[in-house]
């Protein structure tokens, strides 16, 4: 009898996910990409494009998740409230013109507003040797930091991570299996919260780089519900020569549409 119940529950799960049209949100946005999801309770991978989920690209600002862990663990900053002084200038050709972030800024605000200049300054203090040590220990990306002239190898150069690797990293982060202290985990989990309701907590980070003639956009994170956790990584890629005003918004719109179809989000 127990076996029948388990099989019935698995059938319901498979049927529910099978009814989800994972390609529809991409068609509606008119853009190519993929969403990779891991159902923690059922140990089930869900792909909109499994082949794409294995292809590594620059992580862009999604790297701020592991970057925040590293700067805290190494003591480069004390906590999320430590303020980094504004450096006075930034390369607007590389990073765009964003006057709203040109001021002294805490780590918490820098994460929320994705202020790249803050993390560039912190990266200079960490150095690539220490980065490589943590990246290897965390199994994060290809650990190739060559090809970037500046400190932000996560936006420019050869460094790359696949959507599936993003998800496995987030799962290890959630389980606190990585080489960081409990305090460091708690701080980063706090600053990652983007939405909290009575039913779920959403922790996530966006990313967008314009390197190599392409726009590469990300949204990665996880949704904690009372009975399960769902990890996700959505990546969109388009030629820079092909305009799409919805590119930035579609990172979130596509992901949320899929998660709503799966009844993960309200």
Regions found by a protein language model. Name each.
Residues 1-21:
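Bacterial Sec-dependent N-terminal signal peptides
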Residues 49-54, 103-105, 112-119, 146-154, ...:
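Flexible glycine/proline-enriched surface loops and loop-helix/loop-strand junctions
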Residues 57-83, 110, 166, 232:
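Active-site SXXK
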Residues 82-99, 126, 152:
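Acidic helix-start/capping segments at beta-turn-to-alpha-helix junctions
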């Amino acid at each position: 009898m127990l076996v029948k119940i388990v099989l019935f529950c698995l059938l319901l799960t498979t049927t529910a996910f099978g009814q989800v049209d994972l390609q529809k949100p991409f068609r509606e946005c008119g853009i190519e990409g993929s969403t990779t999801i891991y159902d923690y309770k059922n140990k089930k991978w869900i792909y909109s494009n499994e082949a794409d989920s294995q292809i590594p690209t620059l992580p862009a600002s999604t790297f701020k998740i592991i970057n925040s862990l590293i700067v805290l663990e190494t003591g480069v900053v004390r906590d999320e409230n430590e303020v980094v002084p504004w450096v006075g200038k930034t390369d607007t050709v590389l990073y765009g013109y964003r006057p709203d972030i040109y001021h002294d800024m805490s780590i918490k605000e820098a994460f929320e507003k994705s202020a790249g200049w803050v993390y560039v300054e912190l990266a200079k203090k960490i150095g690539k040797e220490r980065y490589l040590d943590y990246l290897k220990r965390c199994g994060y990306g290809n650990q190739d930091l060559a090809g970037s002239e500046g400190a932000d190898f996560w936006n420019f150069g050869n460094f790359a991570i696949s959507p599936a690797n993003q998800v496995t990293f987030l799962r290890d982060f959630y389980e606190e299996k990585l080489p960081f202290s409990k305090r460091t985990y708690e701080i980063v989990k706090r600053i990652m919260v983007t939405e909290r309701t009575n039913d779920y907590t959403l922790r996530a980070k966006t990313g967008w780089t314009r390197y190599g003639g392409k726009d590469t956009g990300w949204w990665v994170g996880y949704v904690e519900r009372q009975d399960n956790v769902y990890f996700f990584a959505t990546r969109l890629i388009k030629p820079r020569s092909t305009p799409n005003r919805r590119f930035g918004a579609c990172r979130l719109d596509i992901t949320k549409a899929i998660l709503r179809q799966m009844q993960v989000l309200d």
